[in-house]
Regions:
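C-terminal alpha-helical "lid/dimerization" subdomain adjacent to the S-adenosyl-L-methionine
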Residues: 9, 28, 33-35, 154-206
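A short SAM/SAH-binding and catalytic strip from SAM-dependent methyltransferases
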Residues: 123-135
Length: 217
């Protein structure tokens, strides 16, 4: 199958452009059931089994829509590192942090595959992004590398639906996702990460167009 290949620079420019219109992300989150109160985010984060002592990495954190749910467990303690390639998107995340007076979050602009750290994480997550990040295998490798043995990694990703009549909308969903997100659904994310980690949970949601995957290192 031909893969939708965007370069890291193209993705960065796309998301900087969208972030110059903050209302875009609000509409996108509501339409795609991906708000900061999303049941999909809540389920994935719950399965990370976090507590207030933990150090967590949010890969491609975007505007910070995972932060509220993560803070439910960290309780403004522990440590949360959010990384993203888009500076303008991170600016929106900083506003969210300031609005909520969170003191335990650090934001870093970086290509996720290139991120390095000496201190390991108790858990990592990447939501609605692993099919967008161009070097996705290297990003998965990075998450595995920086998580402690026994730590968990959660992913919410995009896929073609295999659910009944929802399959009729596959081409529309794929086209929309490419144009407004740079999504490449031809990636075998589950197979790649499960070759190196133990699968804890897998479930398809949103008409079969999303999946929630949690693994343990």
């Amino acid at each position: 199958m031909k893969s939708n290949m965007f370069t890291a620079r193209q993705i960065q420019k796309m998301y900087d452009f969208f972030s110059s219109m903050p209302w875009f992300w609000e509409i996108d989150a509501i339409t795609c059931r991906a708000t900061e109160n999303s049941s999909y985010r809540a389920q994935a984060i719950k399965l990370l089994e976090l507590d207030s002592t933990h150090r967590v990495l949010d890969v491609a954190c975007g505007t910070g829509l995972n932060f509220m749910l993560i803070q439910k467990y960290l309780k403004n303690q522990g440590s949360l590192i959010g990384i993203d390639v888009s500076a303008k998107t991170l600016n929106l995340a900083r506003k969210r942090i300031g609005k909520n007076n969170w003191k335990n979050i650090e934001l870093i602009q970086t290509d996720s595959a290139s991120y390095q750290t000496e201190a390991l994480f108790d858990a990592a997550l990447c939501t609605f992004a692993i099919e967008i990040i161009p070097p996705y295998r290297q990003t998965i490798d990075m998450m595995i590398r920086v998580v402690k043995p026994g730590g968990r990694i959660a992913i919410i990703g995009f896929k073609q639906s295999s659910w009944g009549y929802f399959k009729l909308f596959n081409s529309i969903f794929k086209g929309f996702s490419v144009v407004f997100g740079g999504v490449d659904m031809n990636r075998d994310v589950r197979g790649y990460i499960c070759a190196n980690c133990r699968e804890i949970f897998y479930n398809e949601v949103y008409g079969g167009f999303y999946y929630i995957l949690v693994v343990q290192k």
